[in-house]
Design a protein with these regions (language model features):
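Beta-rich carbohydrate-recognition and catalytic domains
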Residues: 1-50, 58-111, 115-169, 177-228, ...
């Protein structure tokens, strides 16, 4: 996000399966959008979690900062979202975190995307079914609204997978823009469980935040390497009218980089 003349970026650090998974979340800042200096780090041990997923950083109307953290409940397929708040990102303290999206015995909740417009907070969060552990990789994006960004009212599924398409196994919204009367969302999709961690990016549109419809029959973007993963795309509007994109992309060796483009 852009604040006080700088770009602040929240991201997670991840090791391969069996070697730690998402072991930390970092917040860094930059003056050019490409070269970042770390501001703070939160490690998975501090959050009593098996893994940390993509975080989300917001600023409240009173100027304070919030970092929403997706946490894997140890020994389960369950996910929850906690939040920490501080006057500045450098002051985030994991000891002050509290749960805002607990999920339940049937649903894991993670990867919130949050947009505040006026007095209303909009959120799209990824939900995973827990009834059958073998199917827990399936995902839909549900929408919720709030007046404070802490207590949320759920309104149901906004975007799900499409049978027979490249995103049939699930859809995870990663970025949302309000453009006049149209809502444009970017999302991760996959067709099979084997494509977990190698999702590709699609685009969906709608006129209401509660209902988004995928556009086209093919992904918008993917990596040319290995499993083809290009995911967690986010879009930042700059003061000069250009946009900066950030996304995770699979490299030739199978590792994932965080990359940026200026458009």
């Amino acid at each position: 996000m852009l604040a006080d003349g700088e770009i602040f970026l929240a991201y997670r650090l991840r090791r391969p399966l069996g070697h730690g998974r998402g072991y930390a979340v970092a917040v860094a800042r930059s003056t050019d959008g490409e070269h970042f200096d770390p501001v703070t780090m939160i490690y998975k041990e501090e959050m009593a979690t098996d893994s940390l997923e993509r975080p989300y950083l917001v600023r409240t109307p009173d100027g304070s900062w919030r970092l929403y953290l997706s946490c894997a409940t140890p020994g389960t397929k369950h996910w929850r979202v906690e939040v920490v708040e501080a006057a500045h990102p450098s002051e985030f303290d994991s000891r002050r975190s509290h749960v805002v999206l607990p999920g339940d015995s049937k649903t894991g909740v993670k990867d919130p995307v949050i947009v505040r417009r006026g007095d209303e907070w909009h959120m799209w969060a990824t939900c995973h079914p827990l009834d059958d552990p073998a199917e827990a990789d399936q995902m839909v994006t549900e929408y919720a609204c709030s007046t404070d960004g802490i207590t949320w009212t759920w309104a149901g599924v906004a975007l799900g997978g499409r049978p027979g398409h490249w995103d049939s196994r699930g859809a995870r919204v990663t970025s949302v823009c309000f453009d006049g009367g149209t809502i444009v969302a970017y999302y991760d999709g996959r067709a099979t469980a084997a494509e977990n961690y190698e999702e590709r990016t699609g685009v969906a549109i709608g006129t209401e935040p509660t209902v988004l419809a995928a556009v086209g029959t093919e992904p918008l973007a993917w990596s040319p390497y290995h499993g083809g993963g290009l995911r967690y795309l986010d879009l930042l509007s700059l003061p000069d009218g250009r946009k900066r994109l950030y996304y995770e992309m699979t490299r030739p060796d199978g590792a994932h980089d965080l990359r940026t483009e200026l458009q």
